[in-house]
């Protein structure tokens, strides 16, 4: 009988979490949802020097923002030490591990000799018990490490969902340290015990873990566990072709939120960063889960494309509810010195979002492009001299007068503008540009009738009158 699907995301809370990291949560999450399985969150926090609570918070916050909900966890490895020690004791009883007294200095010297001889540096099994072998005397005062008794013959073979069949000879693998002298277990051992205890059926992770896989499989088999399906994801590259990392300028997951990206856009983009469904570029979370499979995971490194993300974000911004955008934009307005009271006194923010969103790649950009609605106009002197000429002043005055009595609709404003243009034999830019400058302080706005409608009759008429006085 096939086991119910159980996947996991197992990050180390040692700082920065970027798109390349969180992709290793997205794909197992999607696979678990697709297969009606269970998605487990496990925090691998055994690196006490580098693990921080702030990093855990960043992981949880990033997952929550993208909607990557987990069914179990978060489990913390540091809270499972008793379980690891229990399994270590069982392995000692079964002669699956053995104490090794080789010092770090001795191991370094051994590796140097091996390199000099053109051999692969590895532990040579000095302390591995074998029938008829006489072991050295344990040195006084030295606490040993525990090494796993790796098989000496045969191969580790698995059918990777991304890489295909992978075969590693056991002769290539030395006896791995699975417990340090102080008794704390090492990474590869903890991972195996966790995957076994948590019933993980599919391990979907970055291909930087490929070298760990044969070692983990051997430990898992020694413990009587069933080997999961492995899918090792190729690296995510930055735009310069380097591995994505903080050192190479990668943005944190929450940095995208703080830059004005929508989570649905980032999730859509991230989904395509190593997986495809035909030519589909834009799809909902629900479609992604419905379509996701391991067969269409990419086999080559995926390269981050910021322009592509901006294009996707613009699409989702245009589709987004204007009231939602208004709430998201408020912090960006605040950062620009436009507080809630100023917004409340100005044009309807929801309406501003509806008008301004089509041209923006981010919510931050919408706010930046919309400051004209909440600040007094301060047009450039050169632009004023160019557009507000003596020749156009009579038309401006007539337009202002018409707006005093016109019905305040987009259609009525457009009709008044058209009538003045006809009466003065002007082309649209000759009147629209000075009106934009005097009312909004800039010539760069959407359709003039839509902009004036949002400003409101009183503001428009008073600003035109003040400029013409």
UniProtKB/Swiss-Prot annotation:
One of its GO terms (molecular function) is zinc ion binding. GO terms for cellular component: cytosol. Coiled coil: none annotated. It catalyses: tRNA(Glu) + L-glutamate + ATP = L-glutamyl-tRNA(Glu) + AMP + diphosphate. Transmembrane segments: none annotated. Residues 118-131 have a biased composition (Basic and acidic residues). A motif ('HIGH' region) lies at residues 11-21. Its main location: cytoplasm. Its EC number is 6.1.1.17. GO terms for biological process: glutamyl-tRNA aminoacylation. Residues 118-139 are annotated as: Disordered. A motif ('KMSKS' region) lies at residues 243-247. Keywords: Aminoacyl-tRNA synthetase, ATP-binding, Cytoplasm, Ligase, Nucleotide-binding, Protein biosynthesis. InterPro entries: aa-tRNA-synth_I_cd-bd, aa-tRNA-synth_I_codon-bd_sub2, aa-tRNA-synth_I_CS, aa_tRNA-synth_I_cd-bd_sf, Glu-tRNA-ligase_bac/mito, Glu-tRNA-synth_I_codon-bd_sub1, Glu/Gln-tRNA-synth, Glu/Gln-tRNA-synth_Ib_cat-dom. ATP binds at residue 246. It is found in: Cytoplasm. Belongs to the class-I aminoacyl-tRNA synthetase family. Glutamate--tRNA ligase type 1 subfamily. Catalyzes the attachment of glutamate to tRNA(Glu) in a two-step reaction: glutamate is first activated by ATP to form Glu-AMP and then transferred to the acceptor end of tRNA(Glu). Monomer. This is Glutamate--tRNA ligase. The lineage of its organism: Bacteria, Pseudomonadati, Pseudomonadota, Betaproteobacteria, Burkholderiales. The gene is gltX.
């Amino acid at each position: 009988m096939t086991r119910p699907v159980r996947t996991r995301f197992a990050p180390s809370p040692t700082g920065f979490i970027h798109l390349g990291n969180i992709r290793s949560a997205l794909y197992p999450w999607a696979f678990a949802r697709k297969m009606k399985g269970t998605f487990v969150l496990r925090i691998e926090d055994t690196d006490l020097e580098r693990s921080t609570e702030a990093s855990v918070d960043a992981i949880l916050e990033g997952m929550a923002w993208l909607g990557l909900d987990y069914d179990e966890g978060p489990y913390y490895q540091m809270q499972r030490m008793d379980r690891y020690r229990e399994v270590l004791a069982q392995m000692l009883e079964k002669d699956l591990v053995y104490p090794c007294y080789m010092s770090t200095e001795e191991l370094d010297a051994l590796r140097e000799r091996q390199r000099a001889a053109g051999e692969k540096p590895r532990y040579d099994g000095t302390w591995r018990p074998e029938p008829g072998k006489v072991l050295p005397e344990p040195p006084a005062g030295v606490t040993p490490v525990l090494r796993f008794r790796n098989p000496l013959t045969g191969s580790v073979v698995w059918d990777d969902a991304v890489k295909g069949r992978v075969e590693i000879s056991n002769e290539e693998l030395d006896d791995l340290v699975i417990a340090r002298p102080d008794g704390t277990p090492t990474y590869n051992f903890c991972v195996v015990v966790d995957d076994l205890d948590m019933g993980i059926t599919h391990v979907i992770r970055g291909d930087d873990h490929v070298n760990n896989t044969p070692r983990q499989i051997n430990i898992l088999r020694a413990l009587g566990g069933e080997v999961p399906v492995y899918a090792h994801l190729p690296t995510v590259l930055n735009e310069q072709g380097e591995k994505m990392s903080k050192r190479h300028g990668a943005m944190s997951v929450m940095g995208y939120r703080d830059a004005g990206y929508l989570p649905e856009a980032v999730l859509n983009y991230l989904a395509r960063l190593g997986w495809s469904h035909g030519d589909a570029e834009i799809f909902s979370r629900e479609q992604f889960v419905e379509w996701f499979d391991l067969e269409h995971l990419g086999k080559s490194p995926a390269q981050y494309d910021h322009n592509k993300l901006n294009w996707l974000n613009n699409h989702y911004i245009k589709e987004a509810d204007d009231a939602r955008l208004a709430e998201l934009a408020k912090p960006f307005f605040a950062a620009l010195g436009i507080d809630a009271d100023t917004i409340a006194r100005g044009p309807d923010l929801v309406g501003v979002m509806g008008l301004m969103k089509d041209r923006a790649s981010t919510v931050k950009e919408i706010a930046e492009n919309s400051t004209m609605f909440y600040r007094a106009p301060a047009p450039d002197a050169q632009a004023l001299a160019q557009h507000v000429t003596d020749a156009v002043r009579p038309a401006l005055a007539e337009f202002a007068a018409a707006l005093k009595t016109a019905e305040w609709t987009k259609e009525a404003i457009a009709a008044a503008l058209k009538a003045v243009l006809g009466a003065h034999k002007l082309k649209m830019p000759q009147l629209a540009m000075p009106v934009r400058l005097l009312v909004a302080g800039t010539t760069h706005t959407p359709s003039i009738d839509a902009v004036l409608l949002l400003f409101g009759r009183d503001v428009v008429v008073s600003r035109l009158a003040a400029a013409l006085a």
